[in-house]
């Protein structure tokens, strides 16, 4: 088996560059591409990526890429790969698939042929015609794009947004990975006050606190790669120990959130406790329209209701206007919000100083920041 393999850290549309920079900071050079960031690394590096990436959805091992213009070419290409290095005679290996602009447009047929080719390979290697599939799962994916087939193994298992601290999503759930990306893209930096005036169940502020405390987002969960065959388990254990040692919750200061819903605030506190950050973020019941904070500099960051239903739109627009007033009451502060509402800036009362477009789930959104310092004229 080789020391280095090709990997992909998948990401929501618009966040590929954010994930590539995360990998670079881990000492793993990466290149952003549509749908994620591609990199070459060891199994140990992939374990660190699973443990530390805040904004990626999954880490995938690329088994190979090859031309497949016919089902026969797909079968032979899959069969030629060393599946026995990762799959035992008892491993379950479900196959998912995706096709785009390929001559082989039947996803179901591509999945079936891929499964059959892997079985034929394993039959010859394990010298058996019967596979129990009674042990751990190794998830296989076949993707065909423009007649190029790519075969991957899922090294994450459960998606990376599942940190383990959130047990209730609320009415407007924001994935932990997206929340971490918004924190990263906002003007806030550790040491500055940060406040979410509509915190809901606390995800944005908890992700900010985890970053400030250098808490690995995957610290309390497991990953599929840890169950793979022939893995460096001692190295994986050391990587976890290093992450535990790096966690410094005493560094957290100046992060707070508020919501008008007492139940949401109670859940935010519970999630904070489950993240191992009990008492490190101040969550309180309060109306965002009455918010008044101290400090000459700081950052507001929030996920407002989008008003997707026509009946909610006017109420949301009035709320956006109140947020514009909130920023005016806090000169020297910035305010960042993610929204799919086309009239957000008009209701807010000013144009955004910075915008970034991406998808929150299936909704096309813009991440807007107001109150950035004007560049000095030369």
Regions found by a protein language model. Give the residues of each.
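A short, flexible beta-alpha/helix-coil linker loop
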Residues: 100-103, 159, 305-309
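C-terminal catalytic and target-recognition region of SAM-dependent MTase-like enzymes
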Residues: 286-378
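Flexible, glycine-/basic-rich loop-and-beta segments that form/coincide
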Residues: 53, 158-163, 167, 372-378
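Non-catalytic nucleic-acid substrate-recognition regions in nucleic-acid-modifying enzymes
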Residues: 2-138, 378
């Amino acid at each position: 088996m080789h020391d280095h393999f090709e990997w992909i850290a998948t990401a929501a549309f618009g966040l590929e560059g954010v994930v590539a920079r995360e990998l670079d900071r881990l000492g793993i050079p990466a290149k952003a591409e549509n749908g994620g960031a591609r990199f070459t690394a060891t199994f140990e590096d992939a374990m660190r990526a699973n443990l530390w990436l805040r904004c990626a959805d999954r880490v995938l091992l690329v088994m190979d890429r090859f031309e497949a213009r016919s089902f026969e070419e797909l079968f032979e290409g899959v069969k030629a790969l060393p599946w026995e290095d990762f799959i035992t005679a008892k491993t379950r290996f479900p196959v998912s698939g995706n096709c785009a602009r390929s001559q082989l447009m039947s996803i179901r047929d591509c999945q079936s042929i891929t499964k059959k080719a892997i079985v034929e390979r394993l039959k010859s290697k394990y010298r058996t015609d019967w596979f129990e599939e009674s042990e751990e799962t190794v998830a296989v994916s076949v993707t065909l794009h423009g007649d190029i087939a790519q075969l991957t193994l899922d090294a994450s298992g459960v998606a990376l947004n599942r940190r383990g601290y959130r047990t209730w999503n609320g009415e407007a759930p924001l994935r932990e990975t997206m929340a971490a990306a918004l924190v990263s893209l906002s003007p806030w930096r550790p040491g500055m006050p940060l406040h979410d005036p509509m915190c809901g169940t606390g995800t944005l502020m908890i992700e900010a606190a985890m970053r400030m405390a250098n808490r690995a987002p995957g610290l309390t969960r497991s990953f599929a790669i840890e169950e793979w065959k022939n893995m460096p388990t001692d190295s994986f254990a050391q990587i976890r120990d290093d992450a535990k040692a790096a966690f410094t919750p005493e560094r957290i200061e100046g992060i707070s959130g508020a919501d008008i819903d007492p139940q949401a605030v109670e859940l935010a506190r519970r999630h904070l406790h489950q993240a191992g950050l009990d008492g490190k973020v101040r969550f309180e019941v309060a109306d965002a329209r009455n918010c008044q904070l101290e400090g000459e500099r700081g950052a507001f960051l929030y996920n407002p209701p989008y008003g997707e239903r026509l009946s909610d739109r006017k109420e949301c627009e009035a709320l956006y206007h109140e947020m514009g007033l909130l920023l005016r009451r806090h000169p020297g502060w910035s305010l960042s919000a993610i929204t799919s509402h086309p009239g957000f800036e008009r209701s807010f009362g000013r144009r955004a100083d910075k915008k970034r477009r991406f998808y929150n789930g299936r909704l096309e959104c813009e991440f807007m920041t107001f109150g950035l310092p004007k560049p000095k004229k030369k």
